[in-house]
From Swiss-Prot:
Cofactor(s) it depends on: FAD
Keywords: FAD, Flavoprotein, NADP, Oxidoreductase
Reactions catalysed according to its record: 2 reduced [2Fe-2S]-[ferredoxin] + NADP(+) + H(+) = 2 oxidized [2Fe-2S]-[ferredoxin] + NADPH
Ligand binding (FAD): T16, D35, Q43, Y48, A88, F122, D287, S328
Keyword Oxidoreductase: yes
The family this protein is said to belong to: Belongs to the ferredoxin--NADP reductase type 2 family.
Cofactor binding remark: Binds 1 FAD per subunit.
Source species: Thermus thermophilus (strain ATCC 27634 / DSM 579 / HB8)
Protein name: Ferredoxin--NADP reductase
Subunit details: Homodimer.
SUPFAM superfamilies the UniProt entry points to: FAD/NAD(P)-binding domain
Upper classification of the organism: Bacteria, Thermotogati, Deinococcota, Deinococci, Thermales
Length: 335
């Protein structure tokens, strides 16, 4: 086979894709990751590497970047091939093989394909306030890549979901002052997080303003002011700030995957209980899939990855059983 061939090709090198690769490797098959981001980890690396994750079994809490580091180390003994900075564009059938071409013009073949592309292509949801785009990268942020960026700064956080509430709490030990505004009195974040947020507000460790929205951002070479307003009375407040963190969610889309001939439902890939898609030999797992009872949780993504990987392995090599046996009875390479 040519050097661009592996037994299994995995579209996506986020946490679910990495764990799928681990299981493919445990079955003795070769595999390649194709991902448009420059490094593994998906959203965990690109959007919130220093955010704690609390719902991974065995970890009371773990930084996103540390979870990715562990997953990369876990899969490393199986010699994965990484094709990073490449977006999977097309999927074609060539005899018994699948051929995936990428945005870099490369073509990779495999006996089976696993799609673990997370939410698909994503970009931050901008709110359209005057000065927002002007100061992007100069005080306006849509993600926290490093908490150190906010050390000693006066930070305005805009949003009412998990990311906004979690970062308001996570930056308490870093920022000089935190103000969180949300356009509604109710928050969409997890109840326990909201309770902790309001406790911090009552204790004077941060300020919460509802129902407030961002009117405009002002400054010179960097952000200096943010004008917010009460959306019922229109009363304005001018806040001296060093950073505006807009966490209003992300706009997601399947991108080229939408043209692969897969059965879709509400911009998600439909799978059965084996994580098989409507195309034989193509499996999917993680946030990109839908099935009755599906929940978008990382811990479920890991389980789906194991199912997809073992069925893909058996498809790629019919001599293999789907059931992999217990990992405790085996030893990974290098152990």
């Amino acid at each position: 086979m040519a050097a661009d061939h592996t037994d299994v090709l995995i579209v996506g090198a986020g946490p679910t894709g990495l764990f799928a690769g681990f299981y493919v490797g445990m079955r003795g098959l070769s595999f390649r990751f194709v991902d448009p981001l420059p490094e593994p980890g998906g959203q965990l690396t690109a959007l919130y590497p220093e955010k704690y994750i609390y719902d991974v079994a065995g970890f009371p809490k773990v930084y996103a970047k540390d979870l990715v580091k562990g997953l990369v180390e876990q899969v490393a003994p199986f010699n994965p091939v990484y094709s990073l900075g490449e977006r999977a564009e097309t999927l074609e059938r060539e005899g018994d093989l699948f051929k995936v071409t990428t945005s870099q013009g490369n073509a990779y073949t495999a006996k089976a394909v696993i799609i673990a592309a997370g939410v698909g292509a994503f970009e931050p949801r901008r709110i359209g306030a005057p000065g927002e785009r002007e100061f992007e990268g100069r005080g306006v942020y849509y993600a926290v890549k490093s908490k150190a960026e906010f050390q000693g700064k006066r930070v305005l956080i805009v949003g009412g979901g998990d990311s906004a509430v979690d970062w308001a709490l996570n930056l308490l030990d870093t920022a000089r002052r935190i103000t969180l505004i949300h356009r509604r009195p109710q928050f969409r974040a997890h109840e326990a997080s909201v309770k902790e947020l309001m406790k911090a507000h009552e204790e004077g460790r941060l300020e919460v303003l509802t129902p407030y929205e961002l009117r405009r951002v002002e400054g010179d070479e960097r952000v200096r002011w943010a004008v917010v307003f009460h959306n019922q009375t229109q009363e304005e407040l001018a806040l001296e700030v060093d950073a505006v963190l807009i966490l209003a969610g992300y706009i997601t889309k399947l991108g080229p995957l939408a043209n692969w001939g897969l059965a879709l439902e509400k911009n998600k890939i439909k799978v059965d209980t084996t994580m098989a898609t409507s195309i034989p030999g193509v499996y999917a797992c993680g946030d990109i899939v839908t099935y009755p009872g599906k929940l978008p949780l990382i811990v479920l993504g890991f389980g789906e990855a194991a199912i997809a990987a073992n069925h893909a392995a058996a498809y790629a090599n019919p001599a293999l059983k789907v059931n992999p046996g217990h990992s405790s009875e085996k030893a990974a390479p290098g152990t």
